Amino acid sequence: QNYAAKKGILCLMDMGHYHPTEVVSEKISSLLCFYDKLALRVSRPVRWDSDHVVIFDDELKEVAKEIIRNHAEDKVIIGLDYFDASINRLVAWTTGERSMEKALLYAALLPNEEMKKLQDNAEFSKLLYLQEHAKMLPFDAVYQEYLTRQGLEEDYFTPLHQYEEEVLSQR
């Protein structure tokens, strides 16, 4: 038993603090077997104290797939790290938030139930085919519709840059 289990507290997986060959996504399904809830600190692992802004990269997509495939949307508490001393914090925050949303949407759009069935039936050739096919599904069109329904523009940089020039620079 680890410290969190002994103390009855949440186990926190901090994506920014693992060996470069280790990834958090590979640990999620195992931890969910032992914990009712799991906390994630999602960041981009960089080996110095800057540039931790979350981006829509392969590991973020894998983390989201683990959450969605394990039906753990209510079991995994997601905290995002936006620290980067060299860029506008509002841009960092919005980039990170939208990247996490994209990853979860991407994972939710995958044919997860069909892939599970193929895995369970040892139909690995068809599973490989489906996994590769899924990479080209029209994710962006669905994301654009999501933004429209939320009343959001895809371009968040322009208004944030304008705010930086007109408001933040005056402080």
Predicted feature locations:
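Active-site-proximal segments of catalytic enzyme domains
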Residues: 1-2
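Histidine-acidic metal/acid-base catalytic patches
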Residues: 5-13, 19-171
